[in-house]
Amino acid sequence: MKPIKKLEGKTVAIVGMGRSWFDYNLAKSHGVHFDEVWAINAVADVIFHDRIFMLDPASRFFDSEDAGGQTESMKKILKTHEGPIYTCELDERAPGLVLFPIDEVVRDLNCYYLNNTVAYAIA
């Protein structure tokens, strides 16, 4: 995955379901502009976004209830979203999936530990 040249010097909001959710909405309500918005998992179902980072396999949502309250939202997103949805494995049921280039990221950043989906998005 090459760096996204059009984003050099731009502002990106990475929005998950924790504190970033509140910070993002507060910023937007005060007129802050973001050049791109990256949604983490099911946040993509409730905000405008340019990209989704979902480092779970799509089968977690299609084939189980392991994601709890996120399951139905993610099924809907995965079936219809054109992408990119960065993930750890492709699934023919989800047309917008793009493999996250973990080997390239680890090599280029010389970083061998990413502990959550936000860390993957930042990398």
Task: List PLM regions with ranges.
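Short beta-strand segments
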Residues: 14-16
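N-terminal pre-catalytic "stem/leader" segment of glycosyltransferase-like enzymes
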Residues: 1-2
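Acidic/Gly/His-enriched mid-domain segments of enzyme catalytic cores or analogous surface patches
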Residues: 5-12, 28-123
